[in-house]
Regions:
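Catalytic Zn2+-binding segment of zinc metalloproteases
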Residues: 189-205
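Hydrophobic helix-coil surface modules that form long, contiguous segments used
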Residues: 2, 7-186, 203, 210
Length: 210
C-alpha cells in the first residue's frame, strides 16, 4: 500500500508526479522509476534531517536524487536499494530515433542469467512502439529481479520488478524456460502502455492491464 510509504490518495484514477531522494550505503545501488540525476556523499546533517535522529552509521553513505516522474498512479511508484549488479542494452525507438537504455538488475549470484532477458527488453520495447504508434515516454527502462519477490512480476513504470524464477534464463532451463522468460517480460513491458500510460479508473477494469 502506497499509504504506508507517503501521504496519498492510493487509487488508480488519481495521478501525480513524484520526486525521490534516497540515503544509502555507498556499496549499494539505488533505483527508482526515473534515472538518478545527482549523487553525492551524504553529510551528517542530511542523516539527521532525513532520519530525525543522529545515527551512528558506519562507512560512507550517499544521497541519490532521482528525476521527477510524469503524472502516474501511486500503485506504479517503485524504489529499491541493494547490492545489485546489472546487464544493460539499448532499445532504438522506431518513432523518434531515441536510444533508450534498458537494464536488468539482480543479485550477484544470478547476474550470469540476465543477458537473454535484457536482450528481450530492448527488442520488445522497440517493437511495441511500432505496434502502438506511441513512443515510450520515460528516459530508461529497468527491471529488478529478486529471489524473494512476493509476486510473479509487477509493471512499475520504468522499474519492472519480479522473481528470478520467471524473468531469468540460463541454458539448463531449455526452450520452455526461455519462452517463459520472454513471455513474462513482454507482458510486463506491454503494461508500460496498457496500465501505466493509459490507466483504468478503478480496479474493476483491471482487464486493461492484462
Amino acid at each position: 500500500s502506497a499509504r504506508r510509504a507517503f501521504p496519498c490518495w492510493d487509487e488508480p484514477s488519481y495521478k501525480a508526479t513524484y520526486s525521490f531522494r534516497m540515503l544509502h550505503s555507498e556499496n549499494t545501488t539505488a533505483l527508482a522509476n526515473m534515472p538518478s540525476v545527482r549523487r553525492r556523499t551524504a553529510r551528517a546533517d542530511d542523516m539527521q534531517r532525513l532520519l530525525h535522529a543522529s545515527p551512528d552509521l558506519r562507512g560512507a553513505w550517499l544521497m541519490t536524487e532521482f528525476d521527477t516522474t510524469p503524472r502516474m498512479s501511486t500503485y506504479l511508484v517503485a524504489w529499491a536499494n541493494g547490492a545489485f549488479q546489472h546487464v544493460s542494452n539499448t532499445a532504438a525507438s522506431p518513432l523518434t530515433g531515441r536510444k533508450i537504455p534498458v537494464s536488468l538488475y539482480t543479485t550477484p549470484e544470478f547476474i550470469q542469467q540476465a543477458a537473454y532477458t535484457t536482450d528481450v527488453m530492448a527488442r520488445v520495447l522497440a517493437m511495441y512502439e511500432k505496434v502502438f504508434r506511441i513512443a515510450y515516454p520515460l528516459p530508461k527502462l529497468d527491471a529488478l529481479v529478486s529471489a524473494d519477490f512476493d509476486f510473479g512480476a509487477m509493471e512499475n513504470w520504468g522499474l519492472i520488478t519480479g522473481r528470478t524464477s520467471v524473468f531469468l534464463h540460463d541454458e539448463t532451463m531449455g526452450l520452455r524456460g526461455q519462452k517463459n522468460a520472454a513471455s513474462v517480460m513482454s507482458h510486463e513491458i506491454a503494461r508500460m502502455w496498457f496500465g501505466d500510460i493509459a490507466t483504468m479508473a478503478w480496479w474493476d477494469n483491471l482487464w486493461l492491464n492484462e
